[in-house]
Amino acid sequence: MNTNTNTNTNISSSGNNIINTPTTNNNNKNNNNNNNNNNNSNNSNNNSSNNNNNNNNAVGVKTGKKVNLKVETPVQNNENSYSLTTSGTFKEGDLLINKKGLLIKGESPKNSSVNDRNKNKSLHSNLNPQLLASPTSSESMDFNQGFYNNNNNNNNNNNNNNLNNFNNLMNNGIDSPQLSGISISTPTSSHSFNNTFTNYYNNNNNYNNYNNNNNSNNNNNNYNNSNNNFNNFNNYNNYGNNNNFNNFNALQSSSNSSFDISSSGSSNNYLNNSANNHPHYDTNLSYDLKDLKIIRVLGRGAGGVVKLAYHETSGTYIALKVITLDIQENIRKQIILELKTLHKTSYPYIVSFYDAFYTEGSIFIALEFMELGSLSDIMKKTSTIPEPVLGKIAFQVLQGLVYLHRKLHLIHRDIKPSNILVNNKGEAKIADFGVSGQLQHTLSKAVTWVGTVTYMSPERISGRSYSFDSEIWSLGLTILECAIGKFPYGSNLPHQQQQPLQQQQQQQQQQQQPLQQQQQQQQQQQQPLQLQLQNLDINNSNNNIRNSNNNNNNNNNNNNNNNNNNNNNVLDISNGGLVDSGSSVPEGMGFWVLLDCIVKEEVPILPSTFSKEFRSFISECLQKEPTERPTASNLLNHEFVKKYQNFNVEKWTANLKQQQ
């Protein structure tokens, strides 16, 4: 019901705001008393630009009490430690070091639209990203006033003022922005939940009022669930409680909607079925260096080191990525890119991001600890991975790719064995988003050349544009390598021919010249460093490349480039940085020969000892033409994936744990 009111607002010199309101009808009185009894409207609009709008648009609250507008800034536990998730929206920019620590320079909340902020969810690490980011929901967030308002016509008028309020709070050093108006919609229903988080910006204790207001107004928003599970969402004290998150999952499963994130008309709903696999952790905890006990080093990379750390407060282990600031510019950009990606990503088959902070001259990123390590680590112990286990891993990774491609429009661009991690439960998750890229929509193409070159698709190596289908090639090559225990190219595997005539001719040549092949293999083993290449054409450029005979096995080209390629790194032609070429270059095969082989030669296939379903899966992934590769969503319907998607890997993981 609309009610015309004229509200006069006076602000005293002491900073106290007295609101005088005229008489309104009884219905509006009840609504205002139930929802605005803590007078948060006055506390939220503490700036001169809002005073004029309050005269015309403010909701009438009949009270004669003075409200203290003093803003209290939470005390930092460690003056030298700053959380990255409270420094502003993650927009295009780079690292900036100042007296406040590590900040993100670029577009700030003041200059960004509401829709841009919606994509990044809340920026406070204490807000559970899993509850705010359901794969089956479409979120809409608005940093409005700190109270629930039944008169929705006033929200539009005060929208700009509310945004200014939020910016003023952030500029004053307040860490937790207020959040209200979370709208979750599905194809069959649309519900709005108006929730306000704890408002500690004033001296009033509004916490109990906040919960009471929400509980009294959200009774109709249960998604047809038998119990009021979503009311637990409003309980701030129990925000990290596992039961609350399970209730949220039950809320999803009780919905009658069949939301398919991949494509319309598909019968698969894998994203919803796996919601219970989210890692449960208390996001109210502070991941500060003083609370972490470093156990050991898990791995090292170009930008830093990953350590196993024990969080004493929660009694949990985390993987702590430590990056020093004395690093190359391209590594700095990768750090920001990974932080932006991790912050907006929450899915069972993506490695969870807990927090990030800057202290002691380094950036610390707290991630989910995966006990069994990467697929590369596993292959070092077991040589190969059984087919049923690979089927289960493919099922899990494909779900992660569907989420990245369809939900976030994101290309990982570096799918390989070392970037797929496994925990003790046998759950495989995608990690390392340092070179990921976002496309505007599913039909977009990328043209940059970043990632591990040996796992790139032929179109990427050739310098052509690429899209999500390039990840299918990388996944197929990864699964194939795990099955045979070595990189497929140069491993004497049979190759799939596109034309039957060429296949017959090659088979005849192999039968007629077995001795010559053996001699060539012996020569390659005896003289792996003396392979001379002439007129090798890569990316339609005529480059004369030959391998020099030295102890470092460096390849020098004739383009006056003095770059040393030690079979580990190759120049990134997109931004001048280094791109890891991987450790999968077969012994005796030059790096450029390998790339030429991937582009020009036929693709490898699985031996006949594997099942026909597995061989078909690899064959469909390793199609030279991108348009002939199935999408990640389509591959979830493949017979190989369906065959092993429910396979129990506990016995396999138990054997691996014994070998550690």
Swiss-Prot record:
Disruption phenotype: Cells are unable to undergo chemotaxis properly during aggregation in response to the chemoattractant cAMP or activate guanylyl cyclase. Form extremely small aggregates resulting in the development of slugs and terminal fruiting bodies that are significantly smaller than those of wild-type cells. Transfer of the temperature-sensitive mutants from a temperature of 18 degrees Celsius to 27 degrees Celsius causes forming aggregates to split into multiple small aggregates. Residues 292-641 form the Protein kinase domain. One of its GO terms (biological process) is MAPK cascade. Pfam families: Pkinase. It catalyses: L-seryl-[protein] + ATP = O-phospho-L-seryl-[protein] + ADP + H(+); L-threonyl-[protein] + ATP = O-phospho-L-threonyl-[protein] + ADP + H(+); L-tyrosyl-[protein] + ATP = O-phospho-L-tyrosyl-[protein] + ADP + H(+). Changing S444E: Constitutively sumoylated and cytosolic. Its EC number is 2.7.12.2. ATP binds at L298, G299, R300, G301, A302, G303, G304, V305, V306, K321. One of its GO terms (molecular function) is ubiquitin binding. The keyword Zinc-finger does not apply. There is a cross-link at K105 (Glycyl lysine isopeptide (Lys-Gly) (interchain with G-Cter in SUMO)). Gene3D superfamilies: Phosphorylase Kinase, domain 1 (3.30.200.20), Transferase(Phosphotransferase) domain 1 (1.10.510.10). Changing T448A: Loss of aggregation ability, sumoylation and translocation. Belongs to the protein kinase superfamily. STE Ser/Thr protein kinase family. MAP kinase kinase subfamily. Interacts with mip1. This is Dual specificity mitogen-activated protein kinase kinase 1. The lineage of its organism: Eukaryota, Amoebozoa, Evosea, Eumycetozoa, Dictyostelia.
